[in-house]
């Protein structure tokens, strides 16, 4: 007997539906005899397996500690791989500054705020080097990742904006603290500059590194070329660092310049470290703590906003 292909397909479809109904009936009758607690457990396990397989679901708690630490460790290893540039170079630059000022000014330079000029100069050079290195760490990392096109390797992992900022800032703080320790040891050995209030030194070095690390993130995100990043560093960061009382006391400035200096957060970072190292300063360290802390909050807020929205990162 000749059977059409359409009739064969209809027969196969009817048989498939019949088998499916029978299988479902067996499954329902089999599960019906199970206790209610077992049924609830099976349903809960099925729900968990479904949720665990969904894309984009965080499965490691409220904070991705492992991811944050991994990003921070990557930033630390990045500058430690070139330790001759990140550790030795700042020490040599600080030594050159002290040597040049010693030769150029000589012993005829009087005391500044009751201490020898070289002793007064050491905390300023230490702090200036710290803030420059903290800025360079985050800015160069983000800018190079954007320009080379591998920023996606940082944005793709399940890290929130807060975790990304903490990871990058942690690397900047580590670099700033390492540079501070190296220069402080050199100052103690060659100039005899000790620590009058070590806690203040630690506080302002950490706050200065956080502030400059955040500014470095902003610069790295904003810059699309290394030329733009260099312009930000040369025309904004370096002048603010040099005009913040690094080499002088602001008491020698005209009143107008003193007012401008007091509006500069970098001044309070340098002044706070100077107070902690040699016990003299142009302003109260408590005022500096408030100003630098407020500046850190503002800068970190901008970093979080840009990381959360992907400004100039995802476009």
Where are these regions (language model features)?
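Histidine (H) residue identity feature
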Residues: 2-5, 262
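Hydrophobic transmembrane alpha-helices and immediately adjacent juxtamembrane helices
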Residues: 16, 35-198, 203-315
């Amino acid at each position: 007997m000749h059977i059409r292909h359409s009739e064969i397909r209809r027969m196969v479809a009817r048989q498939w539906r019949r088998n499916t109904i029978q299988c479902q009936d067996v499954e329902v009758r089999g599960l019906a005899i199970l206790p209610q607690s077992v049924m609830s457990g099976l349903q809960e396990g099925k729900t968990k397996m479904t949720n665990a397989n969904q894309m984009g679901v965080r499965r490691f708690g409220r904070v991705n500690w492992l991811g944050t630490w991994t990003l921070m460790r990557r930033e630390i290893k990045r500058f430690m791989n070139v330790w001759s540039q990140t550790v030795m170079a700042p020490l040599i630059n600080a030594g050159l500054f002290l040597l040049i000022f010693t030769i150029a000014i000589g012993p005829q330079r009087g005391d500044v705020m009751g201490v020898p000029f070289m002793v007064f100069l050491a905390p300023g050079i230490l702090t200036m080097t710290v803030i420059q290195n903290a800025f360079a760490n985050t800015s160069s990392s983000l800018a190079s990742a954007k320009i080379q096109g591998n920023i996606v390797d940082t944005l793709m992992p399940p890290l929130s904006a807060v975790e990304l900022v903490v990871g990058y800032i942690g690397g900047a703080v580590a670099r700033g603290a390492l540079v501070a320790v190296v220069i402080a040891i050199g100052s103690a050995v060659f100039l005899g500059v000790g620590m009058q209030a070590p806690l203040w030194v630690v506080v302002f070095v950490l706050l200065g590194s956080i502030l400059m690390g955040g500014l470095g993130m902003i610069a790295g995100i904003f810059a699309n070329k290394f030329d733009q990043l260099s312009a930000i560093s040369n025309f904004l960061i370096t002048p603010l660092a040099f005009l913040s009382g690094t080499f002088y006391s602001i008491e020698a400035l005209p009143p107008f310049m003193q007012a401008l200096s007091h509006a500069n957060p970098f001044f309070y970072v340098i002044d706070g470290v100077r107070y902690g190292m040699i016990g003299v300063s142009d302003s109260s360290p408590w005022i500096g703590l408030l100003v630098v802390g407020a500046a850190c909050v503002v800068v970190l807020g901008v970093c979080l906003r840009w990381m959360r929205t992907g400004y100039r990162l995802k476009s």
